[in-house]
Regions:
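Contiguous hydrophobic segments
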Residues: 1, 53, 109-130
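N-proximal short alpha-helices
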Residues: 12, 16-20, 30-31, 77-88
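A general secondary-structure boundary signal
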Residues: 16-17, 21, 100-102, 111-112, ...
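Alpha-helical bundle segments that constitute or directly flank the non-heme di-iron/ferroxidase center
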Residues: 2-29, 52, 56, 62-63
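Short amphipathic alpha-helical segments with heptad-repeat character
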Residues: 10-14, 47, 51, 102-105, ...
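Short, helix-capping/interhelical loops that line the mouth of catalytic, cofactor-
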Residues: 1-8, 56-110
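Helix-loop segments that flank and shape redox-cofactor active sites
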Residues: 18-44, 63-71, 118-139
Length: 140
């Protein structure tokens, strides 16, 4: 595990986010929705993807704070597929690809702020880094 303290994790998140924001500042807004950055995905699509996964992490953290074990909500149509994660990501891409850039950017920034806020408020630092706390996460 890379991080062993909340302070180190938060510092890494903030540093990485600042570097990404600096890179994004150099991308003209006219290019943000252009496909082909990775496969058919645009920069906007990648940011929507990051925001979606951050939001899911925030939800899982909230549940954990309430004493509930983490549970990945997988649509029943995908749950039995060996490549369910790829299928899920493709489904989420399809659902978000036509969203306006300003909404995606708002979600991207908001999900970052909310994740940092939730981590700062997390009370049990030992539990945050205990790979055995939630067996379903396989040590992640």
């Amino acid at each position: 595990m890379k991080h062993t303290t909340k302070a180190a994790l938060l510092a890494d998140i903030e540093t990485t986010h600042a570097a990404l924001e600096a890179t994004l500042a150099r991308v003209p807004s006219s290019q943000m929705s252009a496909p082909g950055v990775t496969g058919e995905w645009s920069v906007k699509d990648i940011l929507a993807h990051i925001a979606m996964w951050r939001s899911r992490a925030i939800t899982q953290m909230f549940k954990a704070e309430q004493g509930q074990p983490p549970k990945m909500e997988i649509p029943a149509t995908l749950a039995k597929a060996a490549n369910w994660l790829d299928l899920f990501n493709a489904q989420e891409y399809a659902a978000q690809k036509d969203r306006p850039l300003d909404r995606v950017m708002a979600d991207f920034g908001g999900s970052h702020r909310q994740l940092v806020k939730r981590l700062r408020a997390w009370g049990d630092e030992a539990a945050l880094f205990d790979p055995k706390r939630y067996p379903a996460l396989n040590g992640r």
